[in-house]
Amino acid sequence: MTKDLTSGNPFKIILLFTLPLMLGNLFQQFYSLADTIIVGRFVGVNALAAVGATGSVNYLILGFVIGMCNGFAIPIAQLFGAHDDSDLRRHVANATWLCIAWGVVLTVVTVALTRPIMELMQTPADIIDGASTYIGWIFAGIPFVFLYNMVSAIMRALGDSKTPLYFLVLTSAVNIVLDLVLIINFNMGVLGAAVATDVSQAISGVISLIYLIKKFKILHMTRDEWKYRRSTCRRLSAMGLPMGLQCTITAVGGVIMQWAVNGLGSSVVAAITAAGKTQNLLSCALESIGTAMATYAGQNLGAARLDRVRSGVKSSYIMVVAYSVLAFIALHFGDVVIIGLFLDTKTEVEIVAMARDYMFWNSLFFIPLGALIVWRYTIQGLGYSTLAMMAGVAEMVARTVIALVLIPVLGYFGAELSNPVAWVAACLFLYPAYLWTVKHLENRLLAGHLAMRHSAVGD
């Protein structure tokens, strides 16, 4: 079930590795989309706005969890590329202990602070109860988010991007069925949407864990390999925490933006919710290319093949540009149809118009978005997650400036510019950072090679 990414044509390898990731990300988006569509169509605009008002806070916490799990997997990919199986198993074991500890702490803290957080976000009075209920139950499912994402990250680190897709297809179907039953049949509203998401995530996590234990023989551990090791946890944390914090820092800018947008009223929140869900769906392919590059870069660094890393990044550029152009064209002709999934386009004319404008401005900048994703994940895969985290700071600063300066002056148009400006700001940091990282590692590998030759001559 493992796959070596250190040989073969980079374009073909990355593309084939990306496709299952893309489908998996699409199905993962269906968790959120199913909630949003069914809530918007069967409960109402206020319920849709309530779910949407939690988006940035949701990403703030769950983005940290997912980023940390992906960070824990980077050393695992590097060790797999270096064929150090025993140390690989020790890293998997200690990643498990870290996930358990973080899962307990984050669940307790976030559930306890749900209502104060939504009040701090100046959530409109007519939707704050629904928003607090929804996000509180989502936070209660954090342990299942850890479980599924850590197992999936391990599989990807070992070169298997297909198996997580199969589990997501199943659980997405379960999520949609539960949404329909709990929201429509039992009239549970936003609570039903949150419970459906939690149950679906739990099913995905448990089934994928069972599969990992049974099928990946390379992970069968001795009692000694299961032991907690401080040095191993330090290495895992040195990768995982910056990647988690990168998502969190980026999300802080989103939270500030959400705070500013909430002040524009429920209709604006609903419009951005519908447009934002569509954008997330369309950007899945770009995120998948980036995720593939993290594993690809990690394995090839372990094999001391930085030439393949450069080739892989160039191949990823081609994929990003091709997809971005196609996505822009598809959105140009199908935006009303997509928005119609969330809202009644005949009665909510003003909200539909705002959502269309928002999607237009965002889709114009998909190419820089794709480029920053490729550079960021490549840097992370090469082990420089703190450097990649700094790009999140650039995004946060850009969104903060827009929230505090442009939105008060330009109103909704200022909100439309938030993502494009943040993406460009991150690109201005990440491209030089990528060039420096690869050159720095090439010099280190060359120095190590020369030292070995000198030692051999001396002997």
Name these PLM-found stretches.
Residues 69, 138-156, 164-172, 193-206, ...:
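Short runs within selected transmembrane alpha-helices of multi-pass transporters and secretion channels
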Residues 60-63, 175-180, 205-209, 281-284, ...:
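Hydrophobic transmembrane alpha-helices of multi-pass small-molecule transporters
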Residues 16-35, 137, 148, 171, ...:
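Transmembrane helical elements of multi-pass membrane transporters/channels
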